[in-house]
Amino acid sequence: MTFPDGITLVTGPSGVGKTTLLRALHGELGTSFSSIVKGQKTSLMPQQQYWIGYMTMYEQLSMTTGEQWQTIAEALGLQSHFHKLPDQLSIGQQQRFWLSWVLADNADWILLDEPTSALDDDWATATISLFDRFRRENVKAKMIIVTHDVRLLQGNIHNHRIAL
């Protein structure tokens, strides 16, 4: 299996292995899929984000990606939430923070599992625009997005689509 540069949407019914595909590409399962990305950096946004409860979002994100995440987080409307703890944020806000973290990681492969599932239409639209900008600015990077979200499917930002 090969993945072209740009954005690939992976769709299909629940339970067919879309999340498993992302985990395999990320190297979590020790499968032959790991050889596809061997020697390249991957960054994964899982469906459920896990945070350190006693650290602010600013502390957590700065600890791993430096300051690059802030510009992305600001584009996602999060600047007033930098010094909040995870449990003070909605699931959608947490999802946008994780997305800013992953995109700031400068990985060769960006693996996103349902990245807009907790977002309202306005923030989903902003996120889709961010994906489109990423695609244009990082022509050699690969972004694999697992989704059921019609907004992403109709957003016309992807280069390729795989239906499982």
Identify the function of each model-found stretch:
Residues 99:
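Hydrophobic anchor residue at the start of the ABC signature
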Residues 26:
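Helix-to-loop junction immediately C-terminal to a conserved catalytic motif
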Residues 85, 114-115, 119:
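Walker B catalytic motif
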Residues 121-123:
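Helix N-cap at the start of a conserved alpha-helix in ABC-type nucleotide-binding domains
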